Amino acid sequence: MSTKTSREIALERRKAMSDGGKKAALHSSSTKDRVRSSQDINSTGATSSNKKVLTSPSKSNIPANKIARKSTSSKLSSKELGIERRKAMSTHGKSAINSSDRTRTDVKSDIKVNKVISTEKPQALKDHNNNIKDNQVVKQNIKRRINQKRKPITNTSRDIVLARREAQSKHGKSASKQNTSAASLARRGDPDLSSREISQRVRELRSKTGSTSKQGNGKCRPCGPNKNGSKLNIADASWKVGKSETDSGQTVTGTQANRSLKTTGNEASTCRTVTGTQYMGAEVTGQFCQDKPKYKQPIRASVTTTTSGNKVTGNEVGRSEKVTGDEPGTCKNLTGTEYISANQSKKYCGEVIKKPSKVMQSITTDGLKVSGSLPGRSSLVTGDESGSGKQLTGDQYLGSEPSPKGKSFEKVGSYDTLNGNNVTGTGVGRSDYVTGNEYGSCKNLTGDEYIGSQQYEKFCGSTPKPEARKVGLSLSSKSNLISGTMTGRSKIVTGDEPGSCKVLTGTPYAGLDQINDNCNAEIADDMKSRATVNSGNNSNARLTGLQPGIGGVMTGATKGSCKNLTGTPYIGGDQFLSNCETPPNDASYANQEKSASNSWKEFSVNSPSREKYSAKNTEGVTGNRYEDSSKITGPFDMAEDKVTGTEQFRFEPNKNMTYKQKMKQEESQNIDIPTDKKEPSKITGEGQSAGNITGDDWDRGDKVTGTEGVSARKRNPSRAGFMGAMPPVDNKRNDETEKPDFLITGSSGNTRDGQLVTFSGGARG
C-alpha cells in the first residue's frame, strides 16, 4: 500500500525523468506507487501532508496474479468498481477491461470487497484494516420492483429515432427495413412485453392520437382497378401553368383566370371593357362574346426604334396629339442619349437626322467584327490625317470603312515551297523594307526549304527546280502506299534499266508510277493483271486440298461466302466465280493455266463409285489428287510414262519422242495458237507462270537451261523408277542460238558488246 501522496509521487517521477529519461521513470519507485488499491483511498485521504507517517516506503509491488481483475457488478459498489477498473487499466491497459456491458443490474447483493494482500508489516496492516472497518459502510440489500411502472408509448419522432438506433446497433442496416408500426416500436423498447401489454399500449396510443399513428411497413398502399375511368381524362386535365395572348398581342403565362364552361358564377362582366391590367386572354372574348371589347387604356410598355436602328422599350415619352405644350423642340437635334423614336421624328419633322452612335460596329479586312468606339479618321476632326494612309503592323483596330490602302501585315504568314508543301510562321524571306538581305536570295540552296516560292516570283526572274524529296510516296500494284527512299528506276541513274519492265515475284518495292513511265502499255497491263488485289478469301488462285469449299452439298456454307474476308484465303477463285454473281476482283487467275489444256480432273484417282459420285457433286471438298489414269499400278502409284507425286510435277504424256519431233510439235502448236494467247505456265506452286524469278538473279529463256524444261524432266524426277520408266537420252543441243537482247550486269560488264552469260552453260564470248 502506498503511503505517499500524489504530489510526492509526481515529484519523484519528474526527478527520475530529468535524470534518466522516460526509461528511468518506468523503473522508479513512484511508478510502482501509482498502482493503488481500494484501501489507499481512506489512508491517503485521511493523512494530510503535514502529518506524514514515518514508515519506510514499500519497495515490493503488489503481484499481478493477486489483483482481482474480474469483479462482478453485483458485489461491488460503483465507486469500488471504478477504482478496480482504473487500477487494471493502469497495469495492463485497455485489454484488462473485460466487462461486456456496463449497465447496472436492478438487484444488488451485499458488498464484498476482495482482499488485497500487502507486504507491509503486520502492525501497519492491522492499523489499516481498522481504518477500513471504521470507514466502511455496509449496505443492506434493497428490494426493488422488477416490473417497473408501465409507461405508455407515444409515437413521437424521439421514440422512433431511439428505437431505430437500438435496432441498428443490434441488427445493423437490415433493421432499417423493419416495420415501424406502434406494436413494433413497443416491442423494440421492451422485448420482455407480452402480447397483451403490447395491445394495451397500441389501443392507448390510438385513443389519444387516432388513426394517424398507423404506419405500414414501407410498402405501397393497395389499390385496385380504376372503376371510374379517371385515367382516360389525364390528357384533358388542366395545366398548372397556362399560356394565353392578350388583345395587344402580348403573351401571358401563369395560372389562367379565364372563364370556363365547368365553372358557374363567372359569367358577369365577361364581355365588358375593363380598365387596368388585362389578365384575360383574347380567346375568352372570342368564345363567349359576340363583339370584341375595345380597350382604351394605352399600352404601358412600347417598343420604338432610334435613328441608329437600336430598339428602345419602356414608357413612351414622345410628342402626342392628346397632349398640348410639347411641340417646342420636337424637331431639334439634341445631344445625349436618344430616347425619342425615329417614327415620331418622321411623323412631325418629315426627315430623320442620323446621329453618330457611341458604340459602332465594323468589319476588318480579314472579315472579323470590331465593336466599340472606332478611332478612325473623320471629316469632322482635323489633325488625324498624318499616317492615315500608311500600312501599320500589329492588331487591326480600325474598321473596313477607314482602312488604308492595302492589307495590314499579318503576324503569321503562309508560304508555298517549291515542292508544293505549305509553310506557316514568321516569314524570314527577302523584303522590300529590309536592306542587306539581297545576297543569295535567288540561289538554290540545299537542305530544308523554309522560304516560300513567292520570293522567287517577286525578286527573281525564274523559279529554281525543286530538290528531290527525301521521303517519296508511291503506289504498289496491290494498291498499297509505299513511303520512304524511292529505289525504283530513275532517269538520272544509269544501269538500272534491265528488268525494270519485267514481272517479278515477291514483295513489290517499285510502284505503278515506275511501270507507267518506263514501260509500254502492253507490258504495264500484263504486270497489273498478274498482280491483282486479293482481299481476304476472294483470291483468284485455285486452291486444292482439304478446304471448306462452297457450292457443294454441305449446308450452312453459303452464309457469308461471297463477302470480303481478311486473312488467309481458303476459297479458290473458280469456286468464287461459280457461286457468286459479282465477284469483287478480276476473273483472270493469278496462275495463267487454262482449264482446256490443263484440266484439274486429270490429276485424280477415281473409282467407278467415285466417278458416279463426282458426277453428282463436282464442287465438294477435295483431298489429295493424283493423275487421272486407269493404268496406275504398284504400291507407289506409278504408271506407264508417268511419275506420280505432288501436284508441283506434271509431265507430258509422250516422253519417248525425240527432240526434233518435240520441236516440230511445239512449232505446230504455236502456229495454231494465236499470238495473244500466252503459253501455259511451266512453274506450278508458289511461283508465277511467267516473268523473272527473284533470288539468284537468273532469267528464263528458250536458250537458257535451268531447273525447268525438258532437261529438268530428265534430270530431276520425283521418284526413281525402274529402267523401263526412264526415257532415252536425247542428243545435246549444239545448234547456233541467237543472242538475247537483254544485258546482264555484274561481272560480265555493262556494254552491249560485252560478254553474254547463261547460268547453266557458263560464260560465252
Curated annotation (Swiss-Prot):
Per-repeat ranges for C-repeat: 604-648, 677-711
Sequence segments annotated as region (C-terminal domain): 589-734
Keyword Chloroplast tagged: no
N-repeat repeat segments: 7-22, 79-94, 158-173, 196-211
One Pfam family, short name: CsoS2_M
Keyword set includes Methyltransferase: no
Keywords associated with the record: Bacterial microcompartment, Carbon dioxide fixation, Carboxysome, Photosynthesis, Repeat
Biased composition (Basic and acidic residues): 1-22, 77-87, 187-207, 730-741
Modified how: Unlike H.neapolitanus and predictions for P.marinus strain MIT 9313, this protein is not thought to have ribosomal frameshifting.
Region entry C-terminal peptide, spans: 735-765
InterPro entries, per database record: CSOS2/2B
GO biological process: one example: photosynthesis
Protein known as: Carboxysome assembly protein CsoS2
Biological source species: Prochlorococcus marinus subsp. pastoris (strain CCMP1986 / NIES-2087 / MED4)
Gene: csoS2
